């Protein structure tokens, strides 16, 4: 999974940017290039040797022309200035590198040493490689990116339909107070899969730049509420009460680091289970955060107060408007919104 800090750097060379135009022109002319992005060139006097000082306005055309010389080009990080051209970059030779070509070995060492962006264009393979800190990202062809994104969006649509169906089924069980841990874990796992595909797709969309505008809108529409729903599910079903920040951290752990399984998700939620078959036998009760937020439009900050008083969704559903009004932050309007939203859901489920 591509880390967010690297995604921000990939944006610098996405189609539609001036730097990408320069890189594409360099490849079309069958040139190579080594480009170093810095905040203050004077800080790197021991690394930047030879060449000549320009300190001129940045443009794609200038970068292309300067790439005709053998040396590297030094640009400002905000891509407004060209500082140096035709320089020799001398990073610490003891820094390990897995690259073979001279240009790419220099780029990798320089990025590791300085923590800055270094871009290498291979003359022989016509490939753009971006190095940043200890990361390396090889830029993909637009046709390949479009194909990958289209396939991912199609997969996401199916996963989102399944996730919505599981949430709908869970809602029925919640209102009937017969949710099992298996129901919760199944829903969470589908949501994690959905979010993982989203995170894997995001770098491709970023790399597409202007070409990825439609895909970016589709991705946002498909997943804009999934993160919030997952956090609310974790808050609803953790064996011990957790706040929103803790639930978000648990979710990120599932999405970015853990290989989620029914057992691992159950244990993180606080349930001591040894076998998957146990999940069907463990009855759990929702606290009500998700219903309060999504159906009654009650802010989380007020939802805490409701859950603190009534403990579970089942108890909230049995409370009268007058009972609900005793909660701090709940007036007549919000009390009716909670009561009516629960009644409406029960009525809708009964009539289906």
From Swiss-Prot:
Binding site for ATP: 71, 89, 102-106
InterPro entries: DisA, DisA_sf, DNA_integrity_DisA_N_sf, DNA_integrity_scan_DisA_link, DNA_integrity_scan_DisA_N, DNA_integrity_scanning_protein, HhH_motif, RuvA_2-like
Catalysed transformations (reactions): 2 ATP = 3',3'-c-di-AMP + 2 diphosphate
GO biological process, one term: DNA repair
EC number: 2.7.7.85
GO MF entries: adenylate cyclase activity; ATP binding; catalytic activity, acting on DNA; diadenylate cyclase activity; DNA binding; hydrolase activity
Family: Belongs to the DisA family.
NCBIfam families, sorted: PRK13482.1
Its job: Participates in a DNA-damage check-point. DisA forms globular foci that rapidly scan along the chromosomes searching for lesions.
PANTHER family per record: DIADENYLATE CYCLASE (PTHR34185), DNA INTEGRITY SCANNING PROTEIN DISA (PTHR34185:SF3)
Protein name per the record: DNA integrity scanning protein DisA
Source organism per UniProt: Thermotoga neapolitana (strain ATCC 49049 / DSM 4359 / NBRC 107923 / NS-E)
